[in-house]
Amino acid sequence: MEQIDLLKAKGIIVTELKNKRNELRKQWEETFAKHLSKSQKRKIYLHQHLWHIFSYNKISCSEEQKARDAFNKVKKDGCYIFYYDNQNVLLLENAKSLKAEDIINDIDDYLEDVYVVDTDLTWTYVFTHEEYCGPYFYQLNEE
């Protein structure tokens, strides 16, 4: 995977966790969308794309270049990368050098939603498959 090679070249330790996406996706939703009712989640199609919480303005976040800048500045020791269509999760350690431009969402000529979240789930960066949506950055202690 091109993403893994790029990260390793930056000195980031990458471990591929098999079949962990659904578990991490659930944790992401429980952390960042816990204030939404089931009905609200249904209305914004959260089950389809977690990033709808941002595009439907359900929580305030940084967008576009401000999101990239915030992601580049946030402390990154350990974090996860997970994708919309891939069951595996990448665990990154020693990720201090990870930057927004290092996130690849073009996988085999198919644009993917890419979610990056720190291992404590205190912030998230989302690079969507839609050119006109995102990227988004949200940190829990921002509010």
Report each predicted region and the residues it spans.
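Structured alpha/beta or helical-core interaction and ligand-binding surfaces enriched in interleaved
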Residues: 1-133, 137-143
